[in-house]
């Protein structure tokens, strides 16, 4: 009966879809059968609903009928829209027909691929059997069998074995009906068997991990040969205070169909996004003709990114918000620096262990451990006092004012989130300003696609995914660089039009503030100084107005003052702060860190530079059948020596953001420019988007590889590549090459979303913390796992 119902549903859906697609193709016969198609669609819906309320016995196919009815209804609706608008909107009809075809293909994938296990028992002679808990040999561990309710309760970490002898029947599926204890997150089930091919035990033949509130984790398929003889089920719990109550163990129960509209929606969005960039008339229109659409699209993209950042931080928020914002404790940045500044000193108030003062070399981690000397980890130790290497900008702009106002310490995770959100918003604003000034004629799809790739590959995701105190400096620096870039770009210093000195000053201020967040970001200040000097020749000039030499000179002096004073003042603050701590204005103090290595004696090795360059730029992702399907291995390039690698790693940016490959076309772009512009843009892009990011990557040779550093350089690298690619697109008249460029962007957008999501997810939920978030982990894994 199950096969008959399945065939009826499939034939009915096939008929409805044939009519719908025939109608979109302007065939005559579908119009004659239209009402019958509506009736068949209604039947599929009614069959599913009556099964849900137990009026009909659909043999577990209720969801199957409802799914077919929904898919058919969607495609019929699209066919009706196409029939109404086909004479006026040819391009829209093509997009709708493609969407309908994509929905049909995705529905087939749902039915045949993602529900592959539901057909498992259809391929053999299997009989559903409940394995009794009363007639089974139970060994080992702490267990209690309740004969009245016929259920078994297991407690603690000890392994409990249930052995069923002389089963003598094939086993195609295993279902464990069990309730996990209140604090129990998982239970492992392992099955050893004997079958017709092996009279002794085959160990670990079936493996399951039962998860709480995840019913689909309680059944699995079994690929066994012939009849099973002995069937031994082993239960193991991870903690001593865990428990599980086993109510039923059933073999050969049908695995139910499970259809996910969310999964279909994700795939549909990615496919339509790529297709639309290539073929959609709307997305092929120039940005200047669709300003409102581009802004709205950018706003939606930014809002989604902000929600993603919030969700990553929220996943680790397990206390009431009020309690989090009333913290009495903090870390080196949120509390120790705050207390020190309030006390009017630059050294931290933390007491130094006398044993540390007495050590010959306190910077040797192994020596401190061997002598059992207490030391503050990742603090700077100089002249008998503790200091902080980390930037003071977040302290004076957020943590200190908050403590002065409330008497509490601002929470780290929400500080990282706040700076991350500011950075995400201003990254979009910077990108839109970049388009408005240089690429107004670029197609909307290319423009929005570039924004998606840039936001997805910006690196800020790894920062908000793990909110330790290290990430405060990264996130605040990311925000300041994005804000500074926005004001510098909108000052018209790089483009035509009157230069806005106040905006240039704000750009200078925030870029300098970035250095007070993270000293490494000083490289962007150097680039900004060069750019400001390059704009000096245009300073004070107005179109059609000729100024006297003296007035022009005074305006240029004022221009330089606007650009230099904010940066100079903050540089003086940083230099004074360095001198007050380490007796030298140029000493940031990192070599005095009590950390993984003795930086006072570490030596430079060129090979360590190559490790960073390879892993950040070139490391290829690998595919695996385990969700989220892509991962990248960190490699030290077989270079001998101690090189620190933090938890987590990502693929090279050339894979995460495919448009970075546009740098290979830089020569073609430069040939189209006159000599003056060729030199100008070589300096601007080469310095800001290539050289300075490479300097940052090379500078981490001493501190080692950490995934969070990608937020320092990823988006500047990408925006330079996009500038090259967009320029070539606008200046080529070959429509074939333009289409190839749109296809490349159509591929780059889904690729960036998939690869970056996979690496961020793996970083956020590595194996050793997955069970802490078992609900999220299992739900996402279930969503995309086939077997």
Please provide the spans of the model-predicted regions.
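Transmembrane-helix signature of polytopic, membrane-embedded enzymes
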Residues: 30-42, 427-459, 479, 496-503, ...
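Transmembrane-helix motifs of polytopic, lipid-linked glycan transferases
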Residues: 408-440, 483-487
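Perimembrane helix-loop-helix junctions
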Residues: 524-568
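Membrane-interface alpha helices of multi-pass inner-membrane proteins
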Residues: 482, 503-518, 525, 566-574
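Interfacial juxtamembrane loops and adjacent helix segments
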Residues: 343-390, 431, 454-465, 595-599, ...
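Start-transfer (signal-anchor) and selected internal transmembrane alpha helices
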Residues: 2-37, 66-116, 262-330, 447, ...
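Hydrophobic, aromatic-rich transmembrane alpha-helices
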Residues: 13-23, 628-678
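Specific aromatic-rich, kink-prone transmembrane helix
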Residues: 476-496, 511, 525-528, 716-720
């Amino acid at each position: 009966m199950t096969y008959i119902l399945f065939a009826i549903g499939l034939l009915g859906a096939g008929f409805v879809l044939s009519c719908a697609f025939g109608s979109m193709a302007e065939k005559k016969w579908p119009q004659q059968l239209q009402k019958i198609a509506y009736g068949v669609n209604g039947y599929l819906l009614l069959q599913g609903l009556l099964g849900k309320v137990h009026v009909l016995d659909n043999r577990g196919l209720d969801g199957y009928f409802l799914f077919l009815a929904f898919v058919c209804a969607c495609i019929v609706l699209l066919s009706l829209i196409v029939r109404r608008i086909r004479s006026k909107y040819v391009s829209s009809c093509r997009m709708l027909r493609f969407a309908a075809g994509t929905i049909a293909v995705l529905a087939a994938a749902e039915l045949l691929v993602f529900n592959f296990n539901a057909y498992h028992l259809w391929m053999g002679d299997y009989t559903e059997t409940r394995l009794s808990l009363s007639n089974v040999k139970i060994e080992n561990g702490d267990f209690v069998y309740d004969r009245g309710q016929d259920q078994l309760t297991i407690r603690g970490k000890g392994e409990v074995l249930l052995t069923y002898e002389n089963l003598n029947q094939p086993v195609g599926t295993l279902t464990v009906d069990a309730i996990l204890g209140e604090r129990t997150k998982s239970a492992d089930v392992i099955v050893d068997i004997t079958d017709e091919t092996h009279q002794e035990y085959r160990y670990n033949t079936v493996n399951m991990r039962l998860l709480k509130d995840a019913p689909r984790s309680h059944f699995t398929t079994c690929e066994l040969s012939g009849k099973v003889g002995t069937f031994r089920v082993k239960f193991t719990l991870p903690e001593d205070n865990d428990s599980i109550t086993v109510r039923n163990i059933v073999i050969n129960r049908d695995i139910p169909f499970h259809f996910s509209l969310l999964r279909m929606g994700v795939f549909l969005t990615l496919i339509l996004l790529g297709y639309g960039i290539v073929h959609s008339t709307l997305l092929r229109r120039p940005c200047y003709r669709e300003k409102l659409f581009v802004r709205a699209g950018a706003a939606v993209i930014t809002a989604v990114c902000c929600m993603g950042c919030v969700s990553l931080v929220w996943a680790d928020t397990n206390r009431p918000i009020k309690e989090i914002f009333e913290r009495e404790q903090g870390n080196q940045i949120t509390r120790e620096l705050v207390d020190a500044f309030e006390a009017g000193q630059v050294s931290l108030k933390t007491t130094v262990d006398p044993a540390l003062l007495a050590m010959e070399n306190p910077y040797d981690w192994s020596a401190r451990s061997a002598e059992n000397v207490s030391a503050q980890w990742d603090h700077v130790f100089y002249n008998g006092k503790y200091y902080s290497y980390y930037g003071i900008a977040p302290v004076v702009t957020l943590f200190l004012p908050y403590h002065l106002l409330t008497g509490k310490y601002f929470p780290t995770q929400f500080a990282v989130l706040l700076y991350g959100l500011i950075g995400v918003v201003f990254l979009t604003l910077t990108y839109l300003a970049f388009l408005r000034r240089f690429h107004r004629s670029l197609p909307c799809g290319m423009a929005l696609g570039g924004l998606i790739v840039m936001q997805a590959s910006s690196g800020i995701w790894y920062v908000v995914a793990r909110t330790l105190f290290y990430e405060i400096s990264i996130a605040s620096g990311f925000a300041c660089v994005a804000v500074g870039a926005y004001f510098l770009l909108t000052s018209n210093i790089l483009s035509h039009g009157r230069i806005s000195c106040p905006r240039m000053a704000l750009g200078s201020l925030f870029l300098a503030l970035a250095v007070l967040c993270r000293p490494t970001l000083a490289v962007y200040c150097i680039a900004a100084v060069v750019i400001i000097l390059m704009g000096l020749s245009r300073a004070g000039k107005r179109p059609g107005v000729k100024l006297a030499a003296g007035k022009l000179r005074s305006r240029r002096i004022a221009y330089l003052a606007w650009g230099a004073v904010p940066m100079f003042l903050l540089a003086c603050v940083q230099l004074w702060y360095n001198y007050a701590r380490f007796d030298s204005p140029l000493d940031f103090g990192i070599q005095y860190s009590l950390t993984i290595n003795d930086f006072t004696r570490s030596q430079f090795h060129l090979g360590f530079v190559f490790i960073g360059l390879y892993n950040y730029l070139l490391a290829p992702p690998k595919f695996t059948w385990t969700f989220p399907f892509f991962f990248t291995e960190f490699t030290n390039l077989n270079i001998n020596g101690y090189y620190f690698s933090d938890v987590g790693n990502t693929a090279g940016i050339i894979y995460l953001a495919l448009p970075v490959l546009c740098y290979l076309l830089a020569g073609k772009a430069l040939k189209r420019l006159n000599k003056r512009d060729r030199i100008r843009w070589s300096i601007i892009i080469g310095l800001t988007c290539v050289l300075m990011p490479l300097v940052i990557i090379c500078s981490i040779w001493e501190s080692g590889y950490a995934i969070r550093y990608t937020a320092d350089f990823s988006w500047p690298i990408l925006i330079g590549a996009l500038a090259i690619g967009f320029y070539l697109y606008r200046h080529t008249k070959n429509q074939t090459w333009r289409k190839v460029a749109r296809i490349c962007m159509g591929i780059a957008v889904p690729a960036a979303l998939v690869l970056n999501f996979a690496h961020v997810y793996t970083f956020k939920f590595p194996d050793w913390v997955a069970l802490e978030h078992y609900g999220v982990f299992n739900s996402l894994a279930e969503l995309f796992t086939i077997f």
